[in-house]
Amino acid sequence: YRDHRALLFFSTRRSSDLFAECAAPPCVIWLQGDLGAGKTLFARAFIHALGYDGYVKSPSYGLLETYRAGGIQVLHLDLYRIEDPEELEFLAIRDLFDDATVLLVEWPDRGGSLLPAADLVLQFFEQDETRRIRCEAVSSTGAALAARTA
């Protein structure tokens, strides 16, 4: 990991562990922020907090990684490298996403209307040399998740 401070922060119960405990599929979580803001680190810690013991790799080149943890399927999607939202059709996201799935999406703005709507939007940013996450619930599912993590 490049930034141990971020890994420690995102591994605390105030962030990824807490969200993972409260996440109930189906759920779509958009991860927004600049390059290096901690989106992938958060996703790794989130997936491990669900109980996945293996290596969680960045989906930057393959676009999509799939994990099964605690009876939940987690799809981790990174759209940074796509040039056209139509490229998502080749991944068959709609076919993979079901009632037992949590979908984590980095760079969701690049997915256009082909992505499932977000339940929760996490905005990663730095303030006063500290990494922070702003949480916005955009559905009733997201509001319930945000309420359980408060």
Protein language model annotation of sequence segments:
Residues 34:
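P-loop (Walker A) phosphate-binding loop of NTP-binding proteins
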